[in-house]
C-alpha cells in the first residue's frame, strides 16, 4: 500500500523572517486604492480635533482608511469593524496591526462630522482633475430615507396649534376665577395680549405670595375658598408647563409640519417602501444628490418631502462646495417650477428640467384639449385670448400667489363676454356665468424654453442619461450596498454618515470603471501615488458629453 504524503502543517511554527502582511493582498485589490487615496488627501483640518497632551490618539488616516473600506464592503457597524480588525487581513494591513475598539471608531466618526465633508469635496476634485468627471453637468434627484427614530413618535403642527389654542382658552377662563386684582394688573383678561409661560410664572408667584399672607381663619367657607384658590394655582402651574411644552414643540418644528420626538431633525414623510400599503408616514430625510458619470458630486439633506423647494438650495450647496455653479442642470418634473426655471436662467445654468405633463405631451397619441387655456389662441399685442367660438376673452386683472418659499407668482385673469347659450358650453366649462381663465405667462414661457431643450438632440441624450445617473446610484445604494435607512440620530450625524458612504461609493465606482477599462490598470504598488496611477486611465473615460472639449473651444 502506497504511503500517503501531506504538506507540512505546523500552525504554531515561528518564522525567522516574518513576511509582509500585504504579500497576500492582490495588487489590484480595492484596498490598495483606498490606502493610496487617503494617503494623498489633505487632512490638516483633522489636527485641530486632537489635544497635544494626554495619551497618543490613533492616526486619523488609519481610522479614515478602515472606515471607508468598511463602507465599501457594506459594513456600517462599528462593532463589526472592530471584529474585522482582528480577523480580516485587509483591515489588519490598513490599520497597521492597530486594534481600536468600537467605541473609539464611533468617537472618531462623530469627531470628524464637520471635516469629513471637506474630505468628500477633495475626492470629487481629484476625480475631476483626472478626467472621471467634469463638474459642468449635474444630474439631480432625491429619495426619502427613513430615520433611526421610532415610527410612532410624531408631533404634528396642526395638533399642537389646536391644543395650544384650547389651552389658552382654559387659562383665560381660570384666570377669570382667581384673584381679580392680579388678573387686571397683568392684563390677562385682555385677549389681545399673548400669554407666555414667563407671564404665567409671574402670575403664579404673585398668587402664591397673596395666599401665603392670608390670615388664619376658622370659618369653613373661607377655608373652602382658600383651598379652592390653592387648587387653581396648582392647576395654573400645570397649564403653564403644558404651554411651555407646546411652545417648545413649535420651536423645534420651525417651518415644518411634523417631527419625531426621538429624532427632532427628522420629518414624517410617505416612503416608497410601504409594507402595509396604507400610505403610513415615517420619520425620515429627503436626500438630494447630484451625480455625473454615476459619481456622487454633491449631496444635501432636506426636511420637506417635495423636491420643488430643494433645487435652489441644492445649487447653493454646489456653489459653496466648489465655488461655482454647474453649466447644465438635469432633473425630472418634480423640480419644474417657475421659481426654479427663473433661478437657473438668471445664473446661467442650462436647464434640462422637465415640467408636469411633459411625458404626456410626448406620447404619439397625445391630442391637446382644445378647450384648455394653453390651447386657446393668444394675441400678445392686445393681450386677449380667443375662445373656441371666436369670442375675445379680455384681461380683467392679475392674481398673485405666494409659494411656500416666499416666491410671488403672477397669473393674468381673462373673462369671456357671452357664454350664455353657447353650444360648446358643456364641453368648455360647467360653472355659472362667463368663463374665466388664469394664465401664468412667465411660467408658460419657461415651459416653452424647456420643451425646446428637452426635445433637442442634446436634451434627448441628457434625458436618457438621467435615468442611469442618480437612479442607478440610488439602486446601488439601497440594494447592492444595503444602505436603506440612516443609522444615526440628528441631521449632523446623518450627514456625517452619508459623507462616509459617498466617499466609499465614489472610490468603489472608480475601481469598477478602472476594471472595466482594463484589468492591468489596477496595479498599485506601494510607492505609486494615486495621481500617477489614475493618469493611465485618464483620457479613456468619456467625460460628460465632451464638456471639456466644449470648454476648450
Which positions does each model-derived feature cover?
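Secretory-pathway/luminal and periplasmic proteins that interact with or process carbohydrate-rich
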Residues: 91-96
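Anion-binding and metal-coordination hotspots
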Residues: 8, 67, 74-87, 98-553
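Intrinsic-disorder/low-complexity peptide segments enriched for small residues
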Residues: 2, 14, 39-41, 62, ...
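Basic, short loop/linker segments at the boundary and entry of helix-turn-helix/winged-helix-like folds
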Residues: 26-68, 441
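A ubiquitous short alpha-helical element
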Residues: 3-5, 50-54, 458-461
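Hydrophobic alpha-helical membrane-insertion signals
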Residues: 1-32
Amino acid at each position: 500500500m502506497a504511503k500517503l504524503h501531506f504538506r507540512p502543517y505546523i500552525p504554531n511554527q515561528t518564522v525567522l523572517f516574518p513576511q509582509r502582511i500585504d504579500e497576500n493582498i492582490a495588487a489590484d485589490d480595492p484596498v490598495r486604492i483606498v490606502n493610496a487615496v487617503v494617503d494623498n488627501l489633505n487632512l490638516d483640518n483633522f489636527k485641530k480635533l486632537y489635544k497635544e497632551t494626554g495619551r497618543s490618539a490613533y492616526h486619523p488616516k488609519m481610522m479614515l482608511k478602515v472606515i471607508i473600506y468598511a463602507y465599501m464592503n457594506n459594513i456600517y457597524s462599528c462593532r463589526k469593524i472592530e471584529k474585522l480588525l482582528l480577523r480580516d487581513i485587509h483591515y489588519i494591513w490598513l490599520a497597521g496591526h492597530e486594534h481600536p475598539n468600537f467605541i473609539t471608531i464611533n468617537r472618531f466618526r462623530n469627531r470628524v462630522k464637520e471635516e469629513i465633508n471637506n474630505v468628500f469635496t477633495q475626492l470629487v476634485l481629484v476625480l475631476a482633475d483626472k478626467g472621471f468627471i467634469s463638474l459642468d453637468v449635474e444630474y439631480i434627484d432625491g429619495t426619502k430615507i427613513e430615520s433611526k427614530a421610532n415610527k410612532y413618535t410624531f408631533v404634528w403642527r396642526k395638533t399642537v396649534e389646536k391644543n395650544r389654542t384650547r389651552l389658552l382658552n382654559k387659562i383665560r377662563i381660570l384666570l377669570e376665577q382667581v384673584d381679580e386684582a392680579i388678573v387686571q394688573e397683568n392684563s390677562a383678561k385682555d385677549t389681545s395680549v399673548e400669554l407666555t409661560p414667563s407671564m404665567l410664572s409671574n402670575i403664579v408667584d404673585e398668587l402664591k405670595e397673596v395666599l401665603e399672607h392670608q390670615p388664619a381663619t376658622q370659618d369653613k367657607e373661607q377655608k373652602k375658598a382658600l383651598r379652592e384658590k390653592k387648587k387653581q394655582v396648582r392647576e395654573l402651574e400645570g397649564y403653564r408647563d403644558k404651554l411651555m411644552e407646546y411652545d417648545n414643540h413649535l420651536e423645534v418644528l420651525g417651518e415644518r409640519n411634523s417631527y419625531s420626538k426621538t429624532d427632532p431633525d427628522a420629518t414624517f414623510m410617505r416612503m416608497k417602501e410601504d409594507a402595509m400599503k396604507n400610505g403610513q408616514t415615517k420619520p425620515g430625510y429627503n436626500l438630494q444628490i447630484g451625480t455625473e458619470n454615476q459619481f456622487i458630486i454633491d449631496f444635501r439633506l432636506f426636511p420637506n418631502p417635495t423636491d420643488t423647494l430643494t433645487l435652489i438650495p441644492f445649487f447653493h450647496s454646489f456653489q459653496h462646495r466648489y465655488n461655482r455653479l454647474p453649466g447644465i442642470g438635469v432633473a425630472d418634473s418634480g423640480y419644474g417650477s417657475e421659481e426654479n426655471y427663473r433661478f437657473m436662467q438668471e445664473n446661467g445654468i442650462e436647464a434640462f428640467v422637465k415640467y408636469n405633463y411633459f411625458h404626456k405631451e410626448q406620447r404619439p397619441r397625445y391630442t391637446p384639449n382644445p378647450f384648455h387655456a394653453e390651447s386657446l389662441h393668444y394675441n400678445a399685442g392686445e393681450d386677449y385670448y380667443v375662445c373656441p367660438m371666436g369670442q375675445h376673452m379680455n384681461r380683467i386683472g392679475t392674481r398673485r400667489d405666494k409659494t411656500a418659499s416666499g416666491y410671488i407668482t403672477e397669473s393674468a385673469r381673462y373673462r369671456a363676454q357671452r357664454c350664455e347659450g353657447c353650444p360648446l358650453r358643456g364641453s368648455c366649462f360647467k360653472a355659472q356665468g362667463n368663463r374665466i381663465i388664469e394664465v401664468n405667462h412667465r411660467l408658460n414661457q419657461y415651459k416653452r424654453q424647456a420643451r425646446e431643450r428637452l426635445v433637442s438632440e442634446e436634451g434627448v441624450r441628457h434625458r436618457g442619461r438621467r435615468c442611469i445617473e442618480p437612479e442607478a446610484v440610488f439602486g446601488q445604494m439601497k440594494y447592492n450596498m444595503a444602505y436603506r435607512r440612516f443609522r444615526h440620530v440628528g441631521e449632523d450625524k446623518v450627514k456625517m454618515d452619508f459623507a462616509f458612504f459617498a466617499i466609499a461609493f465614489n472610490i468603489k465606482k472608480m475601481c469598477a470603471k478602472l476594471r472595466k477599462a482594463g484589468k492591468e490598470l489596477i496595479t498599485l504598488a506601494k510607492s505609486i501615488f494615486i495621481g500617477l496611477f489614475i493618469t493611465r486611465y485618464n483620457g479613456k473615460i468619456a467625460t460628460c458629453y465632451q464638456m471639456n472639449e466644449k470648454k476648450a473651444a
